[in-house]
Amino acid sequence: LINLGIYDEVKETLEKNGKSLAEIEEIELEPSLGNGGLGRLAACFIDSIATLGLNGDGVGLNYHYGLFKQVFENNLQKETPNPWITKESWLTKTDITYPVSFGGFTVQSRLYDIDVVGYNNRTTKLHLFDIESVDESIVGDTIDFDKDDIKKNLTLFLYPDDSDDKGRLLRVYQQYFMVSNAARLILAEAEAKGSNLHDLADYAAVQINDTHPSMVIPELIRLLQEKGILMDEAIEIVSKVCAYTNHTILAEALEKWPISFLEKAVPQLMPIIRELDNKVRAKVADESTYIIKDGLVHMAHMDIHFGYSVNGVAYLHTEILKNTELNNFYKLYPEKFNNKTNGITFRRWLMSCNPELSAYITELIGDGWKKDANELEKLGNFINDDAVLTKLVDIKNAKKAELASYLKKT
């Protein structure tokens, strides 16, 4: 409503009819697509892309139950499914569908879209792929389900329990399902715009947000080979298309999968991954940078070697990556490393969450900040203004009281 410019009008109309926006917000279910750091960042990316009018979309999976809903019974935590998909949801079913092959079986995908409205600008899309054969009935009152039945469970839960091999293997299936669909959608859109695929980098850029989508690199190479492009050129093309965002300073926390998992789930990718590893070994002496090592496939290593950019998400984080944790890679590719400091969409976290503070900021510096966050620096002019500081504290206290009241109710 804020981005459409009709928030105040809708609020006023509801109040005239004895309703409030807060009541409506409680009725509408929040999409259970990931509310952690990566999910929040992805949502902010898409809002920013739409607001800036850039050509960009998000791609993910249409998780039916998200992570879980936390309830307390007898003073103990209990995890239950968190369903959100209803006929009133913002999901739009499309005609786009692809067969996705795993080791020994194939599933059929279906693309659903959610429109993301920019602030006084364009609308972009969040593409969410689902499987046609998903079966919610295999989930009961808890978050336990048959992890072996991939044809039914693939898109049920975000981050399925990975305390055993079945859960970890399910994550591999999920990751490949996402990137295989995304890669084909990207190639189809590029061809529709006139690309001959040899020039794919002129039509597409793929941002690998942490290592979960890393298999998009070998999958794009595989699909380009299916289109008649030879392996070496396909690798060169993909290396100009893919970029990697790192979110951890601990090298040991970087995602790596047992070769046996990939050979079982996505055997078609292993020859390509082995060839990528061979190319690294042919030009690099440092064994710590190899893609395949000790029976594991190191996803971040593949991203760094065969992507055009590697960024951290804060200045200090990026410096640590360059100087310690990924220093061996930095020595190989100093030109690839750069910093992109994480931000937030202040339209959600300020204008939506705190309209009183937003109104006061506009009163002080005008409304240019709503599209350009740099305008907020003008608030520095009031750093010694007691009246302004008192007003800010009053607003803050009022919002704390609102939060306390909400927490008491829930």
Language-model features, listed with the residues they occupy:
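A conserved ligand/cofactor-binding region detector
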Residues: L1-T410
